[in-house]
C-alpha cells in the first residue's frame, strides 16, 4: 500500500458526503451534571399534520447518533489534527494515570525512528501515551466495583434514553389533544426477553447512571474506553441496553489506502456504526490505525494477532509471546479500545475440527491452531492470559474473547469444537473479572435458525452473562452476494435472545473487501436487525421512532417518512423513480396503489364520512357497503364488466 499524496497533503479532508447533516436533522447536545458532559443526539424535525387530518404539531424526535462531530456544521473538521480529546479532563481528574516519556513498545519506537514512514505518520498528536500508575487499575469495571459513577457512565445514561421523556412532554404541550397524542405515540408493545436477569427484571423504565454502574460492575455490560483514546464518545455494550452494531474496515495486502480506511470509518459512523474494528492486514498497519483512532468518536477494536503475524512475515510458527506482548502494548498506547484475542483456541480442540465441512474459518483461530500444531504446545495466549490481563487493566482495554473455532457453514454449527471453545471463554472471563478487566464474548458464525437460541443460552450460562458479540449468525449458506440478508435474519433473532452487539456483514462477505457502498448496506441492514431486537425485547422507547414514521405515513407526510427512516437517501430515491415531481411529495398516494386504491386514503375517507354523518367508523363502513350493494345490482350484478 502506497501513501496517498492527496490524503497526506495539508488540505486532506473527509468525504463531503460523510459530514453533511442528514435531511431535516441537526446535532443537539444534552448537558449532564457538569458542563463538559455534552451528549450528542440527532434531532429530526417533522412537519405539522395536514389540516384535513387534525392540523396538530408534530414535535421533533431524537435518535441515537454515532457520527461524532462530523455531522455538526459548527465543528471544524481537520483529519490531520484529529478530534478533540473529549474525555481528557475526566481521565486527568481521576489522578490514577501517568504520562509516559514516549512510546514503550519496541515496534512503536522502531516505526517512529524509520524515515521511510515519515510521510505516512499522523501529524496531529502532540501528547505522549498514558498508562495506570503502579498498582492502579483504570478500568471502568474497577471504578464501578468501587461504587464510583464516572462521567462516562452518566454520559451513557443520558445517551441511552434518547430524550424520550422530553419528547413525550412536548407532545402533551402540542395542543388540546396533546395528552391523547402522547399516549398514542408513547405506546409500545410489551417485549419478550430471555435468560437470567432478562430485561425488565431489574432495569428502570429510564436508564440511570447508577443502573449503568451496576451493569458494568457485575460484568453484564462493558464501556470500551481506552485512556489513550480520549476522543471517543462513551457508549455501552450490554443486553439491558440498546443493541449495538460493529462495522469492520481495514486494508489488505492487495487493496486500500490509509485515506480510504479513514473515509470508511467516517462513512460507517454516519450510518450508525457503534464501534469500528480495524482489521488491516496489509502494509503500514501501525500508521493506518493511528489515523483511524485519532479521528474516531467511536471505540476502535483490533485483532492484534494479525499485526503480530506481519512482524514474522506471515509465518504463524514463528510467533512468540514476546512479539505478541509488544504488539498489545503498541496498540494499547495508540488507544485501541478492545482487543479480539483467540485465547480459547486450545491444542485439545484443534483435532475436533478435522471432520468439519469448512474447518477453521477464523483467521485468528487458524493462526493459533497452526502455532499449536507446529509446536505441539498449548497456545501462548492461553498460557499467558493473566499477563494479558495486567496489560489490559493498565490502559482500560476491553477483551473481546474471540471465537476462533466458530462454524463457517451451517453444517458445522454447534459442534464440539465450537462449544468446547465457548466453555473455555467462560473460564477466561472469570480470570479477567478477577482483575476487573472488562470482557465480551464473540460468537458465531453460520447457524440455522433453530439452533440460534441454544448458542445464546449456553453463552449466558457458561460465560456468566458477559455481553455476547456475534457475527450474524448467517442462517443459510446459499446466497453469496446477499449474506448481509442471510446474516441479518440471524442477527435480529440472536439480538432478541440477548446478544449485546452485532458484527455487521456486507454484501461482499466471502467475496471481497467491501467498499463504501457495501459498508453502508451492511450498516443499514444491521441497524434494522438491532432495532427489531430492541422492539422484541421491549426496550423502553424502542417503538417511538416506529410510531412517528407510521403516523407520518398515514398522514402522507412523505418527507417525514424519508427522514425518520434509517436511510432517507434511498427512500427518497425509490419514491422519486416513479413520482419525481415535488407535487408527489404531498400526494395522498404512491406509485404502488395509485390514487384510487390506496388503503390509507380509503381509511381516511371512511373516517371523514363517519364524522360527517355523526356515526362510528363501523357504522360508516356498513352504510358504505349498503350503497355499493345497490350499485352492484343496478349495474347487472356482474363481477367483471367488459370495457
UniProtKB/Swiss-Prot annotation:
Its cofactor is [4Fe-4S] cluster. Gene3D superfamilies: 6.10.250.620, Radical SAM ThiC family, central domain (3.20.20.540). Catalyzes the synthesis of the hydroxymethylpyrimidine phosphate (HMP-P) moiety of thiamine from aminoimidazole ribotide (AIR) in a radical S-adenosyl-L-methionine (SAM)-dependent reaction. The gene is thiC. Belongs to the ThiC family. This is Phosphomethylpyrimidine synthase. The lineage of its organism: Bacteria, Pseudomonadati, Pseudomonadota, Betaproteobacteria, Burkholderiales. Homodimer. It catalyses: 5-amino-1-(5-phospho-beta-D-ribosyl)imidazole + S-adenosyl-L-methionine = 4-amino-2-methyl-5-(phosphooxymethyl)pyrimidine + CO + 5'-deoxyadenosine + formate + L-methionine + 3 H(+). Substrate binds at residues 248, 277, 306, 342, 362-364, 403-406, 442, 469.
